[in-house]
Amino acid sequence: KERVEKLVGSSASFLTVCTFHSFCARFLRREAYLLGFPPSFSILDDEDSGKLIQEVAVEANYKKSDPIVKELRSYISRKKNKGEYPDDIKVNPFYVNEKEMVDMYKEYERKKDNALSMDFDDLILKTLYILKNYPEVRQKWSTRYKHLLIDEFQDTNNVQYELINLLSVDNTNLYVVGDPDQTIYTWRGANQKIILDMPRRYPDLEDVILNENYRSTSPILNVANSLISHNKKRVPKDLFTSQSGGLPVIVKSFSKAEEEADYVVNEIEKIAGKSSDAVYSNIAVLYRSSYLTRPFEAELAHRGLPYRIFGGLRFYQRKEVKDVLAYFRVLVNPKDDIAFDRIVNVPSRKIGAASLEIIKKEATEAKLGEYEYIKNVPSDSEIPNRILVALGALVSKMEKTKERLQERSEAYSAILKDFITD
């Protein structure tokens, strides 16, 4: 988005530049009332939906650590990437426990709907449902955009492609950028056939091959071209670069991670020892996932070589940030039990699992969200008095903050600061 602003200037503020999920969230804030959701519905991230799936599995008499929990999460994701909700699934008799999977999937959806929440996959699926079943809404949004540009098109899955087609039917100019050779998200539903099928689906398609590479040197591109040439189902093209020189590509294979680490650290010592200009801060080791660092760290430490690990959690994935956001999710959506469960003991209010189960049970019986329920607990509640006092203090703090937000007489940042430090 920042790059677009630099290229086109202030007029960039009139553009919609976002991901599929961000666009659908924006769409649903306006149109989800058609499905019975308020504009303030909650959006569950992967951690939130994972906890809800665990809860469903536990209620089905499984343990959180049982393999079926991970299997259920993967099952739900696969089905949603195909655009299938529980009622759309035809149970496969050869899939040993699919009937149980569908039942747990259905319970996951029920809990999520009761909490007026959607997960990331819902954002696209519910947008699709509205566009397909409410022609006046589809026309309103498809005529809004005369030009639709899709980047990294090779990573598009079937439901995203259906969304693109629904938004581009009314004289919309469709422009896609993608490289079938870079399809790396098939595990997440990306379908390479979509981009390869474009010439057939759009007979007037104008195809522009961009094959000059500005990042790599010739030795790297020669290896890449040679490897990818073995794939016969592709758009033929050879990458080239105007950059001269470049070191040859070296490929090594090891039977153990420790052997790999030993080799890499040996090479680091060779490089550092060749020249006074070659300092350790100019050398980087890249890895695919953070768990792979262990043998490298062990070997570097063993030899007394200095190193730093870069990376870690994104800002919005940090615990303290998610805790604060959970408080505000409860304020705008009192039915968001997932957010409430996260903050009820942050900071510690000494509310144990048994007391929390009582809250859940009584709130469910009252057909209320957990926060809605603790705002007006009936006199015959089984919640212990000590817990009621702690909950009362929580409600008082939340409602005071809500009043300040609704008055709109102060900067949100000031209210947030007071809320955190209080």
Residue ranges and their predicted role:
Residues 94, 279, 293-305, 318, ...:
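Conserved helicase C-terminal RecA-like lobe
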